């Protein structure tokens, strides 16, 4: 074999090896994905719990079990604000939080706490979820170490109490109503003469049972799933504020996933937009 022939043969062997390595990498890009486990913190509402269960089912189905979801329902990892903070520091991968609770971390979410900003669910979906201004606003959540994933249906807030039905704002005067530590909520209730009392959600049932507060306000799904009807006589369909659930994810966790895994997570989230049983 001439030296020229040897050189050509050597080049061809090298090219074949390089091509082979390239084909192996390309061909195995998604077949050799690292298995991923996601810690998912959820709230007490039936609608969110069902959505969380469906998300787990879809993700594990789409990934053929390469992605598993550990679902912690009923605020097992803390209330929704605590869970969102857990997502910020990386202890929790995904969490569901009401926009009202999340607004303490990202103030633009306060927009959803404006009384009677939305009059029906369709307005919420068209403007509050999918509108151009809303989409721009939601991008900003990345500034506080969270990745906005989706909005889930929660519902309009309604008023319950033990004294009388509420027909006009004046009927709330003097009533001690449990609220979140939310400046917009506090100012709104004070403006109509009520006595807003910030209190942890976990303490609310006992507080109403013992008469520490006269009433509370929440979406129907939360009122029902927490059996507030056992300690409250009246419910008034005031529908004064729409409070969506916001699903957030730790951005570093999301970025650590392969493109295919990210597509699976996004697809499952998109299947659950506007999910509700209330």
Spell out what each predicted region is.
Residues 124-132:
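A gly/proline- and charged-residue-enriched helix-loop-helix capping module
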Residues 1-3:
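N-terminal secretory signal peptides that target proteins for export/translocation
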């Amino acid at each position: 074999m001439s030296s020229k022939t040897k050189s050509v043969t050597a080049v061809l062997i090298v090219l074949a090896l390089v091509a082979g390595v390239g084909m192996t990498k390309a061909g195995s890009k998604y077949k050799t994905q690292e298995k991923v486990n996601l810690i998912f913190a959820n709230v007490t509402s039936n609608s969110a719990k069902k959505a969380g269960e469906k998300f787990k089912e879809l993700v594990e189905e789409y990934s053929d079990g390469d992605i598993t979801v550990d679902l912690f329902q009923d605020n097992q990892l803390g209330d929704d604000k605590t869970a969102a903070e857990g997502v910020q520091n990386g202890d929790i991968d995904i969490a569901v939080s009401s926009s009202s609770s999340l607004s303490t971390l990202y103030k633009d979410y306060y927009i959803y706490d404006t009384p009677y900003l939305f009059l029906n669910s369709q307005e919420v979906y068209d403007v509050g979820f999918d509108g151009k201004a809303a989409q721009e606003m939601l991008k900003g959540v990345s500034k506080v170490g969270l990745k906005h994933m989706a909005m889930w249906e929660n519902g309009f807030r309604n008023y319950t109490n033990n004294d009388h039905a509420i027909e006009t704002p004046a009927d709330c005067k003097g009533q001690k109503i449990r609220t979140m530590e939310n400046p917009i909520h506090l100012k709104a209730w004070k403006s109509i003469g009520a006595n807003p009392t910030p209190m942890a959600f976990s303490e609310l049932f006992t507080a109403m049972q013992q008469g520490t507060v006269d009433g509370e306000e929440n979406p129907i799904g939360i009122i029902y799933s927490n059996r507030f009807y056992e300690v409250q006589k009246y419910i008034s369909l005031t529908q004064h504020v729409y409070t969506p659930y916001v699903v957030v994810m730790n951005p570093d966790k999301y970025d650590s996933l392969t493109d295919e895994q990210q597509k699976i997570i996004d697809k499952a989230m998109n299947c659950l937009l506007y999910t509700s049983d209330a």
